[in-house]
Amino acid sequence: MAHVALYPGSFDPVTNGHVDVVRQACTLVDRLIVAIGVHPGKAPLFSVDERRAMIVEVFSPLAATTGCAIECVTFDNLTVAAAEKSGATILIRGLRDGTDLDYEMQIAGMNQTLVPSVQTIFIPASPTVRPITATLVRQIASMGGDVSAFVPKAVAARLKAKFSQ
């Protein structure tokens, strides 16, 4: 039986932290669905299509080297419902620190009640990427800062282009 997991997030933009979690998740599952959450109340920097393009560009080489099938979908409902709909029995959540753990434990408990067949797996971020957040990356990039240490090269180029418009 193939192990299928869903890794949800806004991915606005994809960071080296996301890459770290995907790399680790690919050692655990056969198929990883990177799921872009679309929330009408939020105003992302990058459109859904731009985020999807970044995900494909960044993760396709990783899929080729790990043998893990990586695909990208969008969802606008409950994360656990998106997992169930896509055939995933595992939710992947990255953890940077204890604050993330406290929050994610609450969500995992609620998800377990809603859809008992979907389990949450927490993946601790590697020490080098723990301080990275997409919010901080956007802020640094918007002020002309160098974000190349925090995001893949292709994403850094997209951020630079976005803020030079």
UniProtKB/Swiss-Prot annotation:
Necessary cofactors: Mg(2+)
GO biological process: coenzyme A biosynthetic process
Chain residues that bind substrate: 10, 42, 79, 93
Class of this enzyme: transferase
One Pfam family in the UniProt entry: CTP_transf_like
Sites marked Transition state stabilizer: 18
Pathway linked to the protein: Cofactor biosynthesis; coenzyme A biosynthesis; CoA from (R)-pantothenate: step 4/5
Keywords: ATP-binding, Coenzyme A biosynthesis, Cytoplasm, Magnesium, Nucleotide-binding, Nucleotidyltransferase, Transferase
Catalysed transformations (reactions): (R)-4'-phosphopantetheine + ATP + H(+) = 3'-dephospho-CoA + diphosphate
Protein residues bound to ATP: 10-11, 18, 94-96, 104, 129-135
Organism superkingdom: Bacteria
UniProt cross-references to InterPro entries, sorted A to Z: Cyt_trans-like, PPAT, Rossmann-like_a/b/a_fold
Gene Ontology molecular function: ATP binding; pantetheine-phosphate adenylyltransferase activity
Enzyme nomenclature, EC number: 2.7.7.3
Localization of this protein: Cytoplasm
GO CC terms in record: cytoplasm
Free-text function comment from the UniProt entry: Reversibly transfers an adenylyl group from ATP to 4'-phosphopantetheine, yielding dephospho-CoA (dPCoA) and pyrophosphate.
Known partners and oligomeric status: Homohexamer.
Family statement drawn from the similarity comment of this UniProt entry: Belongs to the bacterial CoaD family.
Name of this chain's protein: Phosphopantetheine adenylyltransferase
Gene responsible for this protein: coaD
